[in-house]
From Swiss-Prot:
Similarity comment: family membership: Belongs to the class I-like SAM-binding methyltransferase superfamily. Erg6/SMT family.
Pathway(s) served: Steroid metabolism; ergosterol biosynthesis; ergosterol from zymosterol: step 1/5
PANTHER family, per the entry: HYPOTHETICAL LOC100005854 (PTHR44068:SF1), ZGC:194242 (PTHR44068)
Known catalytic reactions: zymosterol + S-adenosyl-L-methionine = fecosterol + S-adenosyl-L-homocysteine + H(+)
GO biological process: ergosterol biosynthetic process; methylation
Alphabetized UniProt keyword annotations: Lipid biosynthesis, Lipid metabolism, Methyltransferase, S-adenosyl-L-methionine, Steroid biosynthesis, Steroid metabolism, Sterol biosynthesis, Sterol metabolism, Transferase
Keyword field contains Amino-acid biosynthesis: no
Entry protein name: Sterol 24-C-methyltransferase
Amino acid sequence: MSSNIKLAQKDYKGDKEFAAALHGKEGHKKHGLGAVMSKNKDAQAAAVEGFFRNWGDKDRSKIEDADEQGRIEDYAGLTKHYYNLVTDFYEYGWGSSFHFSRYYKGEAFRQATARHEHYLAYKMGIQPGMKVLDVGCGVGGPAREIARFTGANIVGLNNNDYQVERGTHYSEVQGFGDQVTYVKGDFMQMDFPDNSFDAVYAIEATVHAPVLEGVYSEIFRVLKPGGVFGVYEWVMTDEYDESNPEHRDICYGIEKGDGIPKMYKREVAVKALENVGFDIEYQEDLAADDAEVPWYYPLAGEWKYVQSLNDIVTIGRTSRLGRMVTMNVIGALEKIGLAPQGSRQVTEALEDAAVNLVAGGKKKLFTPMMLFVSRKPEDKN
């Protein structure tokens, strides 16, 4: 697909006002079901409509091309509305690092999460004092962990005001000062000058780009010559067959449940990196091997891998049984008016995502951790 995508109009003032209306001025300090129940009902309805309007039938074979094109053209609005709706659920189930990890026997969930972040920083060679950009930083869990691990100064870029506020709050509470900061912005059209950063990384975030060349070209632009870009990319693997209806349904379930305009295959990511000028120094699908503990085990609810009391809580929430409990509780709260309309619909989309992520993982059709480490040549600007 061409990278000639119409960029979203920037309306930072309007975005901030909408986030304040939806979440409240102190919403970033609330957690779990309390945060879900505190949303403004009118703003929640607008967010639900804004997210679901470009999704058609559940069966991808019945989807019109116009639906997909609409999502691609509305990439910024789609992603902003998605994270306005799901951030509280993500934190409730997963913590402050919104990504999957490799797991080893005897390793607790939080330990694996931190190691996965450390591994990326290690492969990139991030050093103390470097100025590093985290593209699509979520609420800043990885940024804070990598800052601790490396001593680098991290700038988190995020187009969702609610997540920027939450990340800023967590970093202030944890005493990071100026070492970890957050900036509102669209990663398809960053507001940073050319050659601003020593290194750039993205953890399962650039999948929200309408086309990968667009976001990769912006990363290339803001990276200093000789700088390194590391990414855990979500891609469909070489095993994925677009002509296979089962494969298409799995892909569509992942797209809809995770707010993704369009999923691409591994080869598309490779070509996109090369086309914008990067030299790929390392690439590996970290989910390709038959690991004893699969990356999707928290969603599959495989209790035999639980290693700690914290894991019991986490897997209790992320497993299918835990998700069903959450969905029904949210549905009941919605019926009696304590949760905004559309809350259960959001949990249903997240459930669809979880089921298809597990299916995609088991069939080796999808990976959330296609690792690329690429470098901007010294003579390129």
